[in-house]
């Protein structure tokens, strides 16, 4: 399967849109010091990872040593978050984990991980939070992500469609906030890779430039090699709820 992607230049910021999961984007698309956004659970290390859940955070945990690190911060980070759920909007309080080890086929890579909760607009409105509060929470969260990446010298930032899908924010709103930040801070984060589900990929592609032309190339597959990417194809069309996962 050929992965569709695109690249555009925003002054000194290079933007790519891919439909792979974040760990794969780390190996295929990242350059230099990399920070990956983990849209993590606010009060539970790894979310429902131990229960076999399958979502962005659980994928990161399954391909790295991230999970035991999160568990070690249960008392000083997660437990203290319990009083600040804010009707499912949560706060900008984040956990920065440097040099997480990722392993794939014997190839070990390091990347910093920013654990920061997505505001859940759909639940917040049910909990009598206003539209204005919901919009501000998303804007503040995205601002925090990019500022943390820039402050820590990240050369590549990998993030998903933060706040979209089940969280209830329109993809256009998320994209506009990101575009504005990049336009106001050109080159502050040199490379941004959006590893997004297929259901949001077209919107990100439209916003961040035309796709690179596909050029057919011969592919040699070793006999008996598993077609892992083929297995992943349909999963990217599914908007998985937090706490429901395959492993």
Where is each model-derived feature located?
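Short, small-residue-biased leader/transition segments that mark boundaries at the very start
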Residues: 2-9
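Divalent-metal-activated hydrolytic enzyme cores
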Residues: 108-111, 116-119, 136, 143, ...
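Extended, basic/helix-rich recognition subdomains
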Residues: 1, 148-154, 170
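Glycine-enriched loop-and-adjacent helix/strand subsegments that border the catalytic/binding cleft
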Residues: 22-35, 39-152
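Short acidic/polar active-site loop segments enriched in Thr and Asp
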Residues: 35, 155, 190
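Glycine-rich anion-binding loop/nest that anchors nucleotide
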Residues: 37, 156-166
């Amino acid at each position: 399967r050929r992965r569709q992607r695109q690249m555009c230049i925003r002054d000194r910021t290079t933007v790519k849109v891919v439909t792979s999961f974040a760990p794969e984007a780390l190996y295929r698309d990242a350059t230099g010091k990399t920070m990956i956004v983990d849209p993590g659970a606010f009060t539970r290390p790894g979310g429902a990872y131990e229960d076999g859940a399958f979502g962005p955070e659980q994928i990161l945990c399954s391909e790295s040593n991230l999970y035991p690190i999160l568990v070690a911060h249960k008392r000083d980070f997660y437990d203290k978050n319990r009083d600040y759920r804010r009707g499912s909007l949560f706060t900008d309080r984040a956990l920065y984990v440097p040099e997480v080890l990722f392993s794939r086929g014997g190839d070990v890579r390091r990347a910093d991980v920013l654990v920061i909760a997505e505001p859940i607009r759909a639940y917040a409105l049910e909990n009598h939070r206003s539209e204005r509060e919901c919009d501000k929470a998303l804007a503040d969260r995205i601002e925090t992500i990019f500022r943390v990446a820039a402050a820590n010298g990240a050369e590549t930032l990998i993030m998903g469609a933060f706040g979209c899908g089940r969280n209830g924010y329109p993809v256009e709103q998320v994209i506009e906030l990101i575009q504005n930040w990049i336009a106001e801070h050109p080159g502050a984060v040199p490379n941004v890779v959006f590893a997004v589900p297929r259901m949001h990929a077209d919107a990100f592609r439209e916003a961040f430039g035309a796709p690179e032309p596909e050029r057919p190339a011969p592919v040699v597959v070793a006999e008996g090699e598993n077609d892992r990417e083929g297995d992943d194809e349909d999963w990217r069309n599914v908007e998985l709820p937090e706490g429901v996962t395959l492993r």
